[in-house]
Amino acid sequence: MNYPHPIIAREGWPFIAIAAVVALLIHAVGGFGLAWPFWLLLVFVVQFFRDPPRAIPTQANAVLCPADGRIVAVETAHDPYANREALKISVFMNVFNVHSQRSPVDGAVQKVEYFPGAFLNAALDKASAENERNAVVIQTGSGHTVTAVQIAGLVARRILCYVRAGEPLSRGQRYGFIRFGSRVDVYLPKGSRARVSIGEKVSASSTILAELPEQQ
């Protein structure tokens, strides 16, 4: 599914329109001295919903980062969505990061599962199991399974996903959006080699998150 994203994500258009109208009205009534906080708010909303194009690495076995942010976990963990032991890499997004999600690999969507939940701080490990989340399980052409989980955060209360089971995904393709501070967990096959470390800042699509193992 090719979901068209302009440089300002369309998820943000209503918020930008509302912020702009409020700023204009207050400016018209009270001048810039009264309206400047609302112009500042408009600038923040526009930067939050920015969605710039990114360079996409072509390395065949690369798993690309699905979101902008900071690495908060690199560990062996159980993937409950594909029922396996896996390498788990987690990316935390603060309110200043781009909040669109992009496919980490080329492949076909095996399933999409939504789970209601809490809205804990997404930087916490327990957010992976307790927060509202949406899992997309992808099968690559080489037979690997990659799971990408969108997780709502303390402020984020809306997960958007634009793909369904059976649809193809291309690496770097935009497939979802989380509003206002969140997290993405990626589960990879055992034997995958992480290319990032905890605390590292990463960029969606242009950062290589890990390398998949060769199929036997």
From Swiss-Prot:
Catalytic activity line of the entry: a 1,2-diacyl-sn-glycero-3-phospho-L-serine + H(+) = a 1,2-diacyl-sn-glycero-3-phosphoethanolamine + CO2
EC number: 4.1.1.65
Cofactor stoichiometry and binding remark: Binds 1 pyruvoyl group covalently per subunit.
Post-translational modifications reported in the UniProt record: Is synthesized initially as an inactive proenzyme. Formation of the active enzyme involves a self-maturation process in which the active site pyruvoyl group is generated from an internal serine residue via an autocatalytic post-translational modification. Two non-identical subunits are generated from the proenzyme in this reaction, and the pyruvate is formed at the N-terminus of the alpha chain, which is derived from the carboxyl end of the proenzyme.
Gene Ontology molecular function, alphabetical: phosphatidylserine decarboxylase activity
Coiled-coil annotated spans: none
Residue numbers of Pyruvic acid (Ser) PTMs: S182
Marked site positions, Cleavage (non-hydrolytic): G181, S182
A GO biological process held by the record: phosphatidylethanolamine biosynthetic process
Function: Catalyzes the formation of phosphatidylethanolamine (PtdEtn) from phosphatidylserine (PtdSer).
Subunit annotation: Heterodimer of a large membrane-associated beta subunit and a small pyruvoyl-containing alpha subunit.
Protein's name according to its UniProt entry: Phosphatidylserine decarboxylase proenzyme
